[in-house]
Amino acid sequence: VTVSVTSRWIDIPADGGSFQGYLALPKTGSGPAVIILQEIFGVNSHIRSVADQYAADGYVALAPDVFWRTQPRVELGYEGADRQKAMELLQKTDANTAVADVGAAAKALRALPEVTGKVAAIGYCFGGRLAYLAAAQGSVDLAVAYYGGGIQNSLDQADQVKVPMQFHYGELDAHIPAEAVDAVRQKFAGRQDSALHVYPAADHGFNCGDRASYNAKASALAHGRTLTFLGEHL
C-alpha cells in the first residue's frame, strides 16, 4: 500500500532503560493511537506496513520491539531458519514482562503531543495474546486480537477486561482449534462491547501478505471491521 505517512523509530522508557518502537504518523499529524503488536517475527517490513496502513487510516501507530530484551530490532522471515529463530525468541520471552512493555508503549504514546484521545492495541498471533493481556491489565482503551494463540489459556483474566475487545480467527487455523475459539466466544458472550469473527477458508496469519496463508478477502474484511470497531470506541 503506497500511503502518505511519516515514520520514525522512537525510544520507549522501560525498566530504567529504554527500547525502540516504529512510529507512523497520519497525514494530519495527530490522532488517537494504536499499538501494533508483532507476531513472533519482530517488527519486520510487514509489521511496519501494518503501522503505515493504520497511520493512513488516521491513527498514530506504534509498533514496539517486543523481543528487545533478547534480541533488539530483530527482523525475521516466515520460513526455515528464520521461523526456528522466531520460535526460540518466543520461548525466551516472558509474556508478563512483554505485557508490561506494552503498557510502557501505551504510556509513551499518551505522552506524545501527536496523540489526541485514546490508545488501542491491535495484535497479531503472539501480539494478539499480548493485546488481550494488555486489555486485562487496563493499559489500553481497546484491544483487537488477530488469531491470538493462547488466549484460551488465559480466560481467567477475561473478567478483568473492562474495555472493548474484538477477536479475529481463521477457520482453518491449526494453531488455534475450534474449541479454543468457542471458549473465548463463550467467555465474551453477552458483552455489548465485544465481538468475535471467524473467517471461512482463512488460516493462521491470513492478514500477512508475505505469508503463504495470506487471504486477501479475509484480510480486507477484518481490517474494515477493525476500523469500524476503532471508530465506534476510540
Model-inferred region functions:
Residues V1-L234:
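N-terminal cap/leader regions of alpha/beta-hydrolase-fold enzymes
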